[in-house]
Amino acid sequence: MSIALPPNTRVGAGTVISGDRVTEAQVFRKFASRLDPGLVIGAGCHLDGVCFNVGERGFVSIGDQCRFEEAFLIAEQEIQIGDRVTIGWRATIVDCDFHPLAPAERLTDVVACSPLADGAARLALACRPVVIEDDAWIGPNATILKGVRIGAGAFVEPGAVVVQDVPPRTRVLGNPARAIGSV
């Protein structure tokens, strides 16, 4: 079974997008970008079980020779990922708050996202682009939050929650993630 690509997706030579039958159905289920292109994936990548949750104005760019395993990419604005980046199982990269922070607005937004919405527009979300530079490694179950830049060659330990920029060749761990050494 092959995965059908949205028409506004560009994929480089030799790239494989795979998953079991359950994950194949999820890969582009929440891909709503109206940009053209809304997703660019470089050459020689292997993305297994990755879920693209991309809003109408969202854009995701992935460089060459990347390896992602069951990662979640959530973009209302922009996620840029460089070359030779590895992202481990169940890691989440998100460029926005999932919902507004104020309780009344959050409830309105949850309804807008539900089948009850009947086409209602979502409220504006606080968004800032995420950039992951070349040769970075993002461990399993790590979370990269909006506005963060992961420097070239940085190493994000499994389970880390990254809320601020990580300098190049720096190793981070924890919630919130903090530097524990260099690579």
Regions found by a protein language model. Name each.
Residues 156:
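Binuclear metal-ion centers of metallo-dependent hydrolases, dominated by the metallo-beta-lactamase
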Residues 164:
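Short helix N-cap motif at coil->helix boundaries in the Bergerat
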